[in-house]
Amino acid sequence: MCIRDRTHGAKFLRFSFYNYIWRVRVWDETDTPSEWSREAKFRLVPQGFSSAEWIGAITRKDARLPEGRKFHGGELKKPEVKAAWEDVDTLAKKSICLRKTFRTDKKIAEATAYICGLGFYEFTLNGKKVGDSEFAPLWSDYDKSVYYNMYDVTELLQEGENVAGVLLGNGFYNVQGGRYRKLQISFGAPTLLFSLLVNYEDGTRDVVCSDDSWKYDLSPLTFNCIYGGEDYDARREQKGWNRAGFNDARWRPVVVQEAPKGTLRPQMAAPVKIMERYGVRKVTKLTPEQIASACKSTKRTIDLSAFVLDMGQNLAGFPEITVRGKRGQKVTLVVAEALTEEGACNQRQTGRQHYYEYTLKGEGDETWRPRFSYYGYRYIQVEGAVLKGEKNPRKLPVLKDIQSCFVYNSAKKVSAFECSNPIFNAAHRLIEKAVRSNMQSVFTDCPHREKLGWLEQVHLNGPGLLYNYDLTAFAPQIMQNMADAQHRNGAMPSTAPEYVVFEGPGMDAFAESPEWGGALVVFPYMYYETYGDDSLIKKYYQNMRRYVDYLSTRADNHILSFGLGDWYDYGDFRAGFSRNTPVPLVATAHYYMIVEYLIRAARIVGNADDVRYYNSLANDIVVAFNERFQDYDAAQYGTGSQCSNALPLFLDMVLSRGHSGGYETDRHLERKVFKNLIKDVEAHGNRLTTGDVGNRYLIQTLANYGADELIYKMFNHEETPGYGFQLKFGATTLTEQWDPRQGSSWNHFMMGQIDEWFFNSLVGISPDVKHGYQKFRIAPKPVGDLKYVQSSYETLYGKITVDWTRENGRFKLKLSVPVNTVAVVTLPGEKEPREVESGKHEFVVNEQQTINEP
């Protein structure tokens, strides 16, 4: 069978609002065709929203919203800054409901809604929620890109009167503060752009747009902040407000607002949804003495009714409650991933105060959950209510049900991994839950304290992410965010979207760091390796080039000396800025790597001049690197730390002066540097000393040189640093520090680089020169006391399955190769690979284990 990849521009497709239907069939080796596939359809996005206008309750001018991206940290405490934010019109902070009545008096063939509600929206037609997404649209830098969503609403329209209803919240579009906030920024007051296209069976068409004919009123959401939580007063609900027949005479006409500055783009990435739910695992009633003590440690007043629920899983999301009580009674939900010594919810490390408050309307069972805010938590502290069946002398509301809603991007999981080592299996689950918690509109660092898109994770964890999730739609949006964040001079900030500009003493390193900004250049190539799709490289090549040229302006004799270095490296000191490895070494090595990736990109786009120019630059950088950081006699780089030696080994930067006086590759020196790296790991008790940046290079360098047995020893234990200690501690997501007791977030995935090793070494799967897995390598490494590995990986060509076992010195591999692909298989102890085509294969060999020499 032969299936060819083709990218079709489809220039003959010119009309928006029309469906284009397609289906496929294939022919086998005997030229016998298959049945036709089911029909699929797509449509071209409309060129704009026709006559739709941005509408809301108040204009930016009338709202008196401060401008700028420097409102964070100590800046927020300045009197003039506080005064500016306090002067904002309260209407600009509020959630509003908008409604529009319209008629459809003919038979409807199809109806499609296009909507952008900022910061977040909930859209209903005739009282029914449209779609199942949360926090729509995905957030962005609204000065650069604004995303909208499209829905088929044919089945939701009715003959006669219809009502479109939209609930708006602040999101990242309008971070006003009020409780905890990492930052404050406002692109404008909540706003809506809407267009509903109705095609009738008789060939005619109606369009319902957002304009000054819409009406609005304040919603029952009395407070909503992406950082601080959400309050809801059910007494303010207006029954039927989003249905036909409602009397909106008291509602106010909307105002036409200034449009956001960003380009309107269709949201192509999968939406964020409620993907999992967790019930109560354990209930703990707090005593009056515990509450009194906890009030001091948490810096808030805690009601004497308080009890704490352990939901069993740390996650990103919010609670959903069903409660019964009297009108006006309030239930407060405080969420946290940790507890104080007294057993109360502890937000000290994750940003306080964040909570949810629900005011009852007193009409039987009431079910509610937040709409526009989320947090990272495991525990829920309930105040002002009692559990069903408990004594209730104060006649408090009765909590009949409560669940934790795990909210994350709905991109598909494409792999599975299991082995005979319980620590590795559990570590894989820890990483998965942490990634999912931080896989929101962007890849965030944590789901509570910051919620910012720190970029080092995108490429340092990139291979692991691409092994585990379908990023075909998510990655392009990540790249657009990075392109939007890039400065005019080519600089790349450390976060995208860049909601805050880090300035001031000690903050410059956070503003930009090549280990973070390099994702702009590295990640598109990782995407290309995985999917065989070079579109991101071609689309963002100029951005990549501008960043390299910018770094060149920051270099002194080809040495970069700024950034965070090996952030959070490990040792007998407080984690944070790089301590074991010089920042210039890490920055310059990444500078070289970024240039090398740009050279690959230049070859793909066919720019021979750039290939020559940047090859010369790369040579200058690697020479300067060796002159500055190499200690030839000691066979080490920099301080001789693990990161210092792993980086040049991983990047093939180990050179020495030849007889001609110039620098050339020195394999003898390379072997000595590698041996020193091994010695350092062993000297630390087979433990790492690298950090957020160096972890990947250490693990992959050891793997590349055949030291997988050492990697196994490094992580097959229950001590720090290692995943086993976190598991023993009771963590259910990967923590920011190897020792969770040291504080910081308990829901970070930045230390999850081991997942790459699980797949490319233990499973042994990686793309070959034919990118996109049309041709791929299978080279499993049976290390330690592993008895088996079972794994699968869904490529664009189909599912690869790897199942190996070892027993009595015999290694047995079962392999399934997708149609139209080739696997290059290297079995343990064998040097010569073999190629096998699609189908199921079995191999049995005697075990041999070696450490490769470079």
Feature locations, PLM:
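Helix-terminus loop motifs that line ligand-binding clefts
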Residues: 128-137, 141-143, 341-353, 472-577, ...
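Active-site acid/base region of carbohydrate-active enzymes
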Residues: 120, 191-193, 211-218, 387-430, ...
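Alpha-helical support elements that line or immediately flank enzyme active sites
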Residues: 111-115, 125, 318-337, 380-385, ...
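Extracellular/oxidizing-compartment recognition motifs
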Residues: 4-19, 23-449, 456-457, 473, ...
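Non-catalytic C-terminal accessory modules of carbohydrate-active enzymes
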Residues: 184, 191-195, 208-241, 268, ...
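Alpha-helix capping and helix-loop boundary segments enriched in small/acidic/polar residues
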Residues: 86-93, 112, 130, 138-142, ...
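C-terminal capping/lid segments that line or modulate ligand- or cofactor-binding pockets
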Residues: 164, 232-233, 450, 468, ...
